[in-house]
Amino acid sequence: MVLMIVSGRSGSGKSVALRALEDMGFYCVDNLPVVLLPDLARTLADREISAAVSIDVRNMPESPEIFEQAMSNLPDAFSPQLLFLDADRNTLIRRYSDTRRLHPLSSKNLSLESAIDKESDLLEPLRSRADLIVDTSEMSVHELAEMLRTRLLGKRERELTMVFESFGFKHGIPIDADYVFDVRFLPNPHWDPKLRPMTGLDKPVAAFLDRHTEVHNFIYQTRSYLELWLPMLETNNRSYLTVAIGCTGGKHRSVYIAEQLADYFRSRGKNVQSRHRTLEKRKP
């Protein structure tokens, strides 16, 4: 297991790095006192969870010896790695100007420029010990997260989960949807008394919809649209892509089509989930 220690000057991207590591399955703690590192590692060792901890001037130990002692007391199950993020002075000044945040050392009556320089001196013991130093001056938030995934996991993007959900327009559009497709124009099994009590998960309803060319065309064109843009969506630093399919009541057409799309992308090796909002409401 890995204990990733994330350090660097304020404004260099430590919070972004921690969020990216959390997305990769790390247990993340911001500004944990260094002396507590061994206790955290021992707690997580039994659960076999890698951890990431940020260290900056706010929780920097008074002497390098305290840090070295904490490292030597880590359980053998953990392999410590020190990631140090930095950026050039002008970039840090610009980022602080953009966010209008106070530098942690500004309380010491230092100007922003002086605080940045002072912080650099205080963090030098960690910088000199770093396993990896990353200059984020020319990096966007997404590029930094992508670089960390490449370094640590050997792949460029996080694995996107596609969620296909059916819903009824009379109950409202799901607020979590990235895409909403309206299928109320397709043939409606509701008007067949035998099919009315069934759902899009039942074979007779599926057989009814499968007989209509327009249903096949809609499924084909929708999956083609999603396939066209999926590569770009997968590199957009997102964890989920939610595709909502809506019909009038959310019981027949939307359920069937959501399942058809989910099955198709699942067969292509994608991480896929499906859910049916109206049907879930009907469960006792």
Swiss-Prot record:
Residues 266-284 are annotated as: RNA-binding. The keyword Nucleotide-binding applies. The keyword RNA-binding applies. Changing K283A: Lack of activity. Does not bind GlmY and GlmZ. GO terms for cellular component: protein-containing complex. Disruption phenotype: Cells lacking this gene strongly overproduce the GlmS protein. The modification N6-acetyllysine is found at K251. Keywords: Acetylation, ATP-binding, GTP-binding, Nucleotide-binding, RNA-binding. GTP binds at D56, V57, R58, N59. ATP binds at G8, R9, S10, G11, S12, G13, K14, S15. SUPFAM superfamilies: P-loop containing nucleoside triphosphate hydrolases (SSF52540). One of its GO terms (biological process) is protein homotetramerization. One of its GO terms (molecular function) is ATP binding. Homotrimer. Interacts with the small RNAs GlmY and GlmZ. Interacts with the catalytic domain of RNase E in an RNA-independent manner. Belongs to the RapZ-like family. RapZ subfamily. Modulates the synthesis of GlmS, by affecting the processing and stability of the regulatory small RNA GlmZ. When glucosamine-6-phosphate (GlcN6P) concentrations are high in the cell, RapZ binds GlmZ and targets it to cleavage by RNase E. Consequently, GlmZ is inactivated and unable to activate GlmS synthesis. Under low GlcN6P concentrations, RapZ is sequestered and inactivated by an other regulatory small RNA, GlmY, preventing GlmZ degradation and leading to synthesis of GlmS. Displays ATPase and GTPase activities in vitro. Can also hydrolyze pNPP. This is RNase adapter protein RapZ. It comes from Escherichia coli (strain K12). The lineage of its organism: Bacteria, Pseudomonadati, Pseudomonadota, Gammaproteobacteria, Enterobacterales. The gene is rapZ.
